[in-house]
Swiss-Prot record:
Its main location: cytoplasm. Its EC number is 2.4.99.17. The keyword Cytoplasm applies. It comes from Burkholderia orbicola (strain MC0-3). InterPro entries: QueA, QueA_dom1, QueA_dom2, QueA_sf. GO terms for cellular component: cytoplasm. Monomer. This is S-adenosylmethionine:tRNA ribosyltransferase-isomerase. It catalyses: 7-aminomethyl-7-carbaguanosine(34) in tRNA + S-adenosyl-L-methionine = epoxyqueuosine(34) in tRNA + adenine + L-methionine + 2 H(+). GO terms for molecular function: S-adenosylmethionine:tRNA ribosyltransferase-isomerase activity. Keywords: Cytoplasm, Queuosine biosynthesis, S-adenosyl-L-methionine, Transferase. The lineage of its organism: Bacteria, Pseudomonadati, Pseudomonadota, Betaproteobacteria, Burkholderiales. Pathway: tRNA modification; tRNA-queuosine biosynthesis.
């Protein structure tokens, strides 16, 4: 049984990338194959990704777009507040986190960005329902601020508004970027197309819960946050075709991985094949999980003790990930959202009994 301490490591703070590199594909890429022992580690640059995958493989991208979900404002009393939109729930409604000296009650009016008023509705722990006076996606885009992760120490600027989005982002709804996708630019996508690599998209709107720390030593007691995803029939068909020709399904990012595996696990439990799915998922992937769809994973380097570090450890093997992270720190890779990437190959045998 793994505990929270098993996923801790010491990271020099200067390795936390604070800004994006000027060129998306200039990031480094650590290729990790845990299917052999000891694990094979190869230092590359992200522009070399096409040489690591084969014609007929399928890359699965998350096309969610980050909302300008952060607001500063005030109560009618003048008290200052900070609001982070968690998800849009309707044309004029959203769930949000509110930081204030005292939690606002239902019916309270809040002034956001000195531009418009919202009304607080019912509490949906730990969030508040907000009612907007106009379509909330429009007001969020016009007046909000990009919500950079807490470990990035500068306020979002015009560069972040471009670089903290993937080039293929098209469905607004996330409050954090699917960061593995930040390394792809249009020329790289076109090169992959030209060599016969297939592409498909799904949508998973990344919530603020992605930064939620695990507070229990027994990780089985952790309650995972829930996120909405849409896995279309076109992707299901491409997965089937990829399997038929012997290709690999490669998830671009842990969000793509979670959507694919959530849909596949649900299908498994219902005794049916993978099908188009729109649903909430709180899937928590830890060592012992049996992967059903994904063969390889493009991902960034994750925080100590995080659920995402547990996910990649489940996928590639705990000792493989430990070795890869030690190597990355020794070689001064850049970590977290604006950092470098890994290309992982699935470990064939789960390390403990699991789902």
């Amino acid at each position: 049984m793994f505990t929270l301490s098993d996923f801790d490591f010491n990271l020099p703070p200067e390795l936390i990338a604070q800004t994006a590199l000027p060129d998306r594909t200039a990031s480094r890429l650590l290729e990790v194959d845990g299917s052999v022992a000891p694990a094979r580690l190869v230092d590359r640059h992200f522009a070399e990704l096409p040489s690591c995958i084969a014609p007929g493989d399928l890359l699965v991208f998350n096309d969610t777009k980050v909302l300008k979900a952060r607001f500063f404002g005030q109560k009618a009393s003048g008290g200052k507040i900070e609001v982070l939109i968690e998800r849009v729930t309707g044309t004029h409604t959203a769930l949000a986190q509110i930081r204030a000296s005292k939690s606002p009650g239902a019916g309270t009016t809040l002034r956001l960005a000195d531009a418009f008023d919202v009304t607080v509705g019912e509490r949906v722990e730990p969030f508040f329902t907000l009612h907007f006076p106009a379509p909330c996606l429009d007001l969020i885009e016009q007046h909000g601020r990009l919500p950079l992760p807490p470990y990035i120490e500068h306020d979002a600027d015009a560069t972040d508004e471009t670089r903290y989005q993937t080039v293929y982002a098209s469905n607004p709804g996330a409050v954090a970027a699917p960061t593995a996708g930040l390394h792809f630019d249009q020329p790289l996508l076109e090169k992959l197309d030209a060599m016969g690599v297939e592409r498909a998209t799904l949508t998973l709107h990344v919530g603020a819960g992605t930064f939620q720390p695990v507070r229990v030593e027994n990780i089985a007691e952790h309650k995972m946050h829930s996120e909405w995803y849409d896995l279309p029939q076109s992707l299901v068909d491409k997965i089937a075709a990829t399997r038929a020709r012997g290709g690999n399904v490669i998830a671009v990012g842990t969000t793509s991985m979670r959507a694919l595996e959530a849909a596949a696990r649900s299908a498994d439990e219902a005794g049916r094949p993978l099908a188009a799915t729109q649903a909430e998922t709180d899937i928590f992937i830890t060592p012992g999980y049996r992967f059903r769809v994904v063969d390889r994973l493009v991902t960034n380097f994750h925080l100590p003790k995080s659920t995402l570090l547990m996910l990649v450890s489940a996928f590639a093997g705990v000792e493989t990930i430990r070795a890869a992270y030690r190597h990355a720190i020794e070689e001064r890779y850049r970590f977290f959202s604006y950092g470098d990437a890994m290309l992982l190959t699935r470990r064939d045998t789960p390390e403990a009994p699991g789902a």
